[in-house]
Amino acid sequence: MPQTLLPEPWMVINGNTAMEDLFGVPSRSRFLSAPGLLSKEECPLNLSGNELRSEFAESISCTEQTYGANTVSVGVDTELDLLEFGRSDFRMATSPDAVGYETDEATLHRRQKQIDYGKNTVGYQCYLQQVPKTERKSGVHPRTPNKSKKYSRRSWDMQIKLWRRDLHAWDPPSQNSFQEDHSFKQTQRLLESWLQESNSLQNPDMDWLGLQLSSLQNLGYSEDQIQNSFDWLQFRGHTNDYTYPHWIGL
């Protein structure tokens, strides 16, 4: 009897669906399957030609007893290739850049200085004393930013700003009241000095007139003479824009 002929592997594997039907694994690549997946399966001994063709979709390799040939293997990869591929995957998965860690030394040093500055405040010390680590809740209590994660400069600075602002809520009450009173007194003094300066700038003529009248009283002038002098000064103030003959003496 003539020997049953089977189709060549490249005649059967013509698409992704055929790959999945043949190997039972996603058709990522024939060379990435487990070693020996296609070469260690054996075909049954007593099968007709049609049954052999149906079984070919489930098992590509057949033993020498059935077909009189050596084991047929399609796309068999070596263990060395798989090992090298596994190592490259492991390096990519564990690299600092892949998981988003900051590796720049200058950036890490700058971030640590910002964290140390925040931890040296009175509010942070009170926070450590009043809230133990086991009682802290995310979203409620301040949390120190993670300097090792990769952030943009703007994102990191915003995290530090919000963290320090939350720490100020734990400042002692006496310190808060002292700062508020001190700032209020400074503002009040500044306002009073500004009002005094504005009043002195608005009434320079009145101050000069009061000085002149007090000197006239000391010289013994009567009230009528003082009033006349005052009227004359007012008249002169209203007529400063006009010119007079030289013989008036003004």
From Swiss-Prot:
It comes from Xenopus laevis (African clawed frog). Pfam families: SLBP_RNA_bind. Oocyte. Binds the stem-loop structure of replication-dependent histone mRNAs. Is associated with translationally inactive histone mRNA stored in oocytes. Could be a specific translational repressor. Not involved in histone pre-mRNA processing. The lineage of its organism: Eukaryota, Metazoa, Chordata, Craniata, Vertebrata. Belongs to the SLBP family. GO terms for biological process: mRNA 3'-end processing by stem-loop binding and cleavage; mRNA transport; regulation of translation. A motif (Nuclear localization signal NLS1) lies at residues 14-17. This is Oocyte-specific histone RNA stem-loop-binding protein 2. The gene is slbp2. It comes from the Eukaryota. The keyword Chloroplast does not apply. PANTHER family: HISTONE RNA HAIRPIN-BINDING PROTEIN (PTHR17408), STEM-LOOP BINDING PROTEIN-LIKE (PTHR17408:SF11). A motif (Nuclear localization signal NLS2) lies at residues 77-80. It is found in: Cytoplasm. Keywords: Cytoplasm, RNA-binding, Translation regulation.
